[in-house]
Amino acid sequence: MKDEEFKKAIDFYRALIEKEISDEKIVDGRLVGPRKLRKDDPVDLKDIIHPERPFFDKDVADDLDPLYVTTFRVGNLKKPLSMGKTGYGTDIIAGMELGTKLVKNGFIKSFDEIAAFLAKYKMGILDVFKEEEIENGKMLDLRIYECIECSELPNVGEPICYFETGIIIGILKELTHKEVLAEEKRCWASGYSFCQYDVVIRD
């Protein structure tokens, strides 16, 4: 993705986010976005296949982006709701292992290279929305737009991107050699058009 398109994507989604957050509510103790909640219906195959990702669609010829995403999801997102309760630990650990190896094998050498890597491999558009120093560390508000795992999934009332959470932890832990905590706070699957991760890097 070219720098100009990357910036357009960030600007577009930041404007959208402001409205979505102003319309959010709390359901069962979780933040839920404005899209209609479909909590009692299972996520089925038609929800998983052929999603539209406006900025990545422009970046790939011949309608290949939806096929790329579908292939990933059929392998990784076979049962998002059932795995949400029982398999999230496995997904986080798998993501952490991948994130660690991406750094160890030289695919990502610095914090500034993370966004370019995720965009190149069509995993998502990373926006470092906020960064602040806290006692004994640093806090990051990371947002991912057009996420390969959840973009255009229905609102099931809870975040599901455990694998991506693990990737973030693995990359940052290996880059900083510090304790890293991350939690997905908002997600396509909880009614938004983005994923938000609260990240703490402890000194």
What is the role of each PLM region?
Residues M1-I160, L181, R186-Q196, I201-D203:
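N-terminal accessory segment detector
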Residues C161-H177:
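Active-site helix/loop of acyl-thioester processing domains in fatty-acid/polyketide metabolism
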